[in-house]
């Protein structure tokens, strides 16, 4: 055997010509132990023993401090389990387990059904979680807009968390590296019973919580009781609830089809609310707006023109995202930036808006859009077309941190929403693996070295906030193990 062959055999890249006997094995093992013992005491001198040390002992010494978190090539998905946190109604968290003891965390969109994720379990069992893109392409056909995208997106989050843990790198590193060490947040600020109370809440956001970007809700619901403010509003009932109701109720009737119009008196009243908030915020702090109510294109343009003196950072979801031509008409008619996107699934859903520059800013929610990589692709595509990206978020710290990693890795990013700043327990659901806070004074901390998403659940805290109708906590889900369909979407 040549010296080269002996070397390859010793490092395991060439099979031995003959089986070694037990005596030789014993001698080698004693030599190895003796070597490691000596190395631990004093190390190997390059000028001395190193030149005469067997190659296997050199390899053992040089690699004894290498971190082996798993064998990524041999990883297999063995289970998917869930719990449901009572946050913004209900927010399911999923856990994908493997044959090597490491697991990944993901989140099904706030307000969504855990079964959007569980139905995907049979399609990923036995697969290597590090093949993220292949698995994503396998399951993405089962997603859809809004909460329907939560299952695919939650699984994708968990796969990246697993992959980062397997290779001992943060998720942002797997996405191509980071542009920033801190991620700017914007504070969602819901309506208050009175304008004075709302102004106090805004002041608290700035002076106590240290936020540097705010968002306010301003809707026709705030002026509905002013005589002559609205036209045709009483047809829909007294409260104009935007989220709850039957299929034919106001909440589920798209903006162009309600027949509601805002009279000048109503526009004046809504503009006055924004003016009062600006008097507290000033003009240096970006102030965005949302949740105007369901009224048509023409009234959206009238409202947009009315509030232009207050230089809002954006007008959000003026009409449903499915109408890109209407968004284009609004953005062409006013100077304030126009934004949408929290309910759009996949890059293909954003392209009709981006391609015609119907909006100035896109606004994906990573838990709907398709997960980390797809959301980065959306941001990159928008950047190529001169469109910025903000990010919607209203879930638990799991999806929050997934969004932080994506935001860190996407250049045209502006700000990430935080929807639970007033919760006393939201950030107790997890602990960071690098020991830092999730966020401080308006900025989220990007995990610089922590593998995966950089968080672990705090079980005792999560159990305090489980959905009352489902107190299970990562219980087995064997009913979802078997695949029962032929999934190919083409013939």
Model-based region annotation:
Residues 1-31:
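N-terminal secretory signal peptides
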Residues 28-37, 45-67:
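N-terminal twin-arginine translocation
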Residues 63-105, 422-431, 491:
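Structured beta-strand/loop patches that form or line metal/cofactor-binding pockets in enzymes
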Residues 99-172, 486-490:
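Metal- or metallocofactor-binding catalytic centers and their adjacent structured scaffolds
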Residues 105, 166, 184, 200, ...:
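Ligand-binding pocket scaffold of soluble enzyme catalytic domains
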Residues 122, 127-131, 305, 311-314, ...:
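Shared catalytic-loop signature of beta/alpha-barrel
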Residues 182-328:
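Metal-dependent enolase-superfamily TIM-barrel catalytic cores that perform enediolate-based chemistry
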Residues 453-491:
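Extended hydrophobic packing segments that form well-structured cores
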């Amino acid at each position: 055997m040549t010296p080269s062959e002996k070397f390859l055999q010793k490092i395991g890249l060439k099979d031995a010509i003959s089986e070694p006997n037990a005596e030789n094995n014993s001698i080698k093992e004693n030599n190895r132990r003796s070597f490691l013992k000596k190395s631990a005491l004093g190390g190997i001198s390059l000028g001395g023993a190193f030149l005469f040390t067997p190659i296997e002992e050199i390899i053992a010494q040089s690699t004894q401090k290498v971190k082996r978190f798993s064998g990524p090539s041999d990883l297999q998905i063995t289970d998917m389990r869930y719990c449901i946190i009572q946050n913004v109604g209900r927010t399911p968290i999923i856990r994908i387990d493997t044959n090597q003891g490491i697991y990944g965390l993901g989140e099904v969109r706030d307000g969504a059904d855990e079964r959007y994720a569980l139905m995907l379990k049979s399609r990923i069992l036995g697969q290597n979680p590090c093949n993220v893109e292949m698995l994503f392409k396998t399951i993405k056909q089962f997603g859809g807009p809004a909460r329907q995208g939560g299952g695919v997106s939650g699984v994708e989050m968990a796969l990246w968390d697993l992959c980062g843990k397997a290779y001992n790198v943060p998720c942002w590193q797997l996405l191509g590296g980071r542009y920033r060490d801190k991620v700017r947040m914007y504070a969602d600020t819901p309506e208050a019973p009175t304008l004075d109370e709302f102004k106090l809440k805004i002041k608290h956001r700035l002076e106590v919580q240290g936020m540097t970007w705010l968002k306010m809700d301003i809707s026709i619901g705030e002026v509905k009781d002013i005589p002559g403010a609205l036209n045709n509003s009483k047809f829909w009932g007294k409260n104009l609830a935007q989220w709850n109701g039957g299929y034919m109720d106001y909440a589920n009737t798209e903006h162009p089809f309600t027949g509601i119009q805002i009279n000048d008196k109503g526009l004046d009243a809504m503009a006055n609310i924004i003016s009062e908030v600006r008097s507290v915020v000033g003009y240096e702090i970006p102030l965005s707006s949302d949740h105007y109510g369901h009224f048509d294109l023409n009234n959206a343009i009238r409202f947009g023109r009315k509030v232009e003196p207050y230089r809002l950072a954006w007008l959000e979801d003026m009409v449903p995202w499915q109408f890109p031509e209407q968004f284009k008409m609004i953005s062409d008619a006013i100077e304030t930036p126009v934004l949408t996107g929290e309910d759009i699934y996949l890059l293909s859903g954003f392209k009709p808006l981006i391609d015609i520059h119907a909006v100035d800013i896109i606004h994906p929610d990573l838990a709907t859009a398709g997960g980390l990589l797809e959301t980065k692709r959306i941001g990159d595509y928008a950047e190529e077309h001169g469109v910025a990206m903000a990010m919607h978020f209203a879930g638990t710290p799991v999806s929050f941190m997934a969004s932080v990693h994506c935001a860190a890795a996407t250049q045209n990013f502006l700000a990430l929403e935080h929807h639970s700043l007033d919760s006393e327990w939201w950030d107790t659901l997890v602990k960071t693996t690098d020991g830092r806070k999730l966020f401080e004074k308006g900025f989220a901390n990007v995990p610089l070295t922590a593998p995966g998403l950089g968080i672990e659940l705090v079980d005792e805290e999560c159990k305090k906030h489980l959905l009352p109708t489902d107190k299970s906590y990562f219980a087995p889900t064997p009913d979802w193990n078997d695949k029962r369909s032929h999934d190919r979407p083409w013939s």
